[in-house]
Amino acid sequence: MISTKKTILSSILCFSIILSVLSNFSPKLLYAEQIDTDSLIMENSNNLQTKNNQYSNNNYNDVKFNIAVAADWGCTEDTKKTAANIQSKNPEIVIAAGDLSYEESADCWIDIISPFKSKLMISMGDHEYQDTEGGASGIMNTYLNPLELPKTYYSFDFNNVHFVAIDPYVDYGHNSDQYQFIEDDLKNATSDSRIDWIFVMEHIPMYTSPTEHPADSTIRDIYHPLFDKYGVDIVFSGDNHNYQRTFPLKYNNDNGNSSNPIISDNNQNDYKENTGVIYLTSGTAGKSHYEIEEQAPFVAKQDDKHFGFLNIDINDKTVKGTFYANERELGYYYVDYKNNIIDHFTISKMNAANNEFEKL
């Protein structure tokens, strides 16, 4: 856990250099506060528009949009293919869940994602701390001061979804400012009648099959109970350069060991509401692949051979997730990125009007 003033300052500096070059972003995005997405998105892009009347009784049930999620990007030819794959699905929000350029400069990555940079939301990865240019003083004068000391954890609403970004590289313990912000924010989202879904983005995986990086038990023990308490639906992560989707999970601290969560629904693809949190690792944006040694019992689907991204289709009561790989590979039932499906799942919530579950 990182809690020193020096490290917090470093985290802010690194995140600021990435976000500052995204010219269509408002500095408000960087503050640890809930963003007024209605105004923010209208400021930044004609492609990302949220109108207050979408929350009205007349229009709320018609909400339908999609988001794209990927982590561990780099500046490779495969990164370019992933960007094209994402662009082909025309998402309204793109979540880059950490580890962006892997270079001293963000320029190469910014160039690759330029077709949808106005739609981008970012969570912090370890390479945003390790790889930057200019030194602390240069970044301070150029980026930090004009942005008035922004923080790197935040939340925002888009239509009927509440998004929360956690920064695992600044203090996130129970007594930290970040934890207090996250808890208050989730509590408010849960009590908001306009919100059907809560998605969290956080780079370090809390659960994983055996692969390059083990699961982080510290952040898991702090935040999974909080996610259970406030009904978080999905957690997006990266760090491991492969794709993994868990079953819906409940926190289980069995004799001080939380590595064996409770599988609350063992269906492979279709889930009902409030059965548990689904943890998704999508470190597949293009940097490299990490081999998965075996499949953990709490993992429903995994893949370590393909680059691509996770697409989430959302209406008022249904989430449909689809992992699209970038291209055909010999021996696999996959085609090109126009309709290449590696994994799919659906979460359906009760329709109070007719007591039935809806599906896309």
Predicted regions and their residues:
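Bacterial N-terminal signal peptides that target proteins for export
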Residues: 2-12
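Hydrophobic core
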Residues: 13-21
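A short C-terminal boundary segment appended to hydrolase-like catalytic domains
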Residues: 33-34, 42-44, 49, 289-360
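Residue-level marker for buried hydrophobic side chains located in beta-strands
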Residues: 67-69, 94-96, 122-123, 200, ...
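Active-site glycine-centered loops adjacent to acidic/histidine catalytic or metal-binding residues
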Residues: 72, 98-99, 125-126, 203, ...
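Extended active-site neighborhood of metal-dependent phosphoesterases/phosphodiesterases
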Residues: 87, 105-194, 198, 213-223, ...
